[in-house]
Regions:
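Conserved RecA-like ASCE P-loop NTPase motor core of nucleic-acid helicases/translocases
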Residues: 50-54
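Conserved Walker A/P-loop ATP-binding site and its immediately adjacent core
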Residues: 55-62
Length: 384
């Protein structure tokens, strides 16, 4: 059944599966409760009764938050309770189609002596809620706390038990949020959902590429656009590099949003194959907007951005760069080229530098695609 939140449905694999147990984690204040409250109201209007159980707020507080978000649904039932036996009794009495428990760390079983949030309580409560979902055929959503390292708090057995594990990510001081699946028995784990946090709650972002590029500087050295592929969704991202002389012995390598080891490998290839001396340079690489991009198709963009920053030579503003780079400096083929180029063309880009081996003879692409075989060739073409 559809949740009424298209971005959530995309990540879940097309919609909410009756009888499924979904765990959603994220940093405090990131918007987990807001997302599930909005989804609960939409589900209540579309599919029938939803029981929203809050162990962290009173029913009056949840009601106030729902009113502030402009949510109205007569079938949305709010319960402030932490004892699981009482929650089960309310489920039996109200017979909801969907149950939301916010959060699993606040719920406890009365016949266990340990405190709520302990390993035994989380494990046993998770097992009971799984049984409730399967026997009654209701979809159950659990909110989970995370540790300082960003992993879900509690026993790992909980993640093995549930059908789907979602992470809600983003910078607390930024406006956008990304919902990712790291486990999904009913769909792909490659899809993402993008939201924007506003005064009226979370707003879906159907075109995240435009949002990520909204503040892109034009004519700046070290800035390169690439088209990432998250599942079936293409995303245009700005990869930035800053190369400066090192003043303290060992040069620094700082990476945000990309894979650190891969960036170090690309810098070594730049020095060996393209003759750019980086051993005395600090290099900082960032995926703008706090996004993440760890696929090999970003290799060429990272390398070109570093070369651009080193030489203080900006790229043309209407070009996107795609390709995997091998240790010998060759540019390797990537998948989903046409999908990526179509997204770039839709946002006004007219040129693309891509692996020559990815181009199909006679194919008609939505923009001018130039093939390259080596990193040195790409750098010569783009930054001279």
């Amino acid at each position: 059944m559809h949740s009424g939140v298209a971005e959530l449905d995309r990540v879940l694999g097309g919609g909410v599966v009756p009888g499924s147990l979904v765990l959603i984690g994220g940093d405090p204040g990131i918007g987990k409760s807001t997302l599930l409250l909005q989804a609960s109201a939409a589900l209540a209007r579309a599919a029938g009764p939803v029981l929203y159980v809050s162990g962290e707020e009173s029913a009056a507080q949840v009601k106030l938050r729902a009113e502030r978000l402009g949510l109205a649904a007569s079938e949305l039932l709010i319960l402030a309770e932490t004892q699981l036996e009482t929650i089960e009794a309310h489920v039996g009495a109200s017979e909801p189609r969907t149950l939301v428990v916010d959060s699993i760390q606040t719920v406890y079983l009365g016949d266990l002596e340990s405190a709520p949030g302990s390993v035994s309580q989380v494990r046993e409560c998770g097992g009971r809620l799984m049984g409730l979902a399967k026997t009654r055929g209701i979809a159950v959503f659990l909110v989970g706390h995370v540790t300082k390292e960003g992993a879900l708090a509690g026993p790992r057995v909980l993640e093995h038990l549930v059908d789907t594990v979602l992470y809600f990510e983003g910078e607390r001081h930024a406006t956008y949020r990304v919902l990712r699946a790291v486990k999904n028995r009913f769909g792909s784990t490659n899809e993402i959902g993008v939201f924007e946090m506003t005064d009226g709650g979370l707003r879906e972002v159907p075109n995240p590429s435009a949002m990520f590029l909204a503040e892109r500087p034009h004519g700046a050295a070290g800035s390169v656009i690439m088209a990432a592929l998250e599942g079936t969704r293409p995303l245009l991202l700005e990869l930035q590099a800053l190369v400066t002389p090192a003043h303290f012995g060992t040069p620094r390598r700082t990476v945000l949003g990309a894979e650190y080891n891969r960036v170090c490998l690309l810098l070594a290839i730049l020095e060996k194959r393209a003759g750019i001396p980086l051993q005395s340079q600090d290099v900082f690489v960032n995926v703008a907007g706090g996004a993440r991009c760890q696929e090999p198709a970003a290799d060429l963009a990272i390398a070109v951005a570093s070369a651009s920053s080193y030489g203080e030579r900006p790229l043309a503003p209407d070009v996107v760069v795609l390709g995997e780079v091998g240790l010998t400096g060759e540019v390797r083929a990537i998948g989903g080229l046409e999908t990526r180029l179509r997204e770039a063309a839709a946002l006004g880009f007219t040129q693309a530098v891509v692996p020559r081996s990815s181009l199909v003879a006679g194919a008609r692409y939505p923009l001018t695609a130039t093939g390259v075989s080596t990193l040195e060739e790409a750098i010569g073409l783009l930054v001279g």
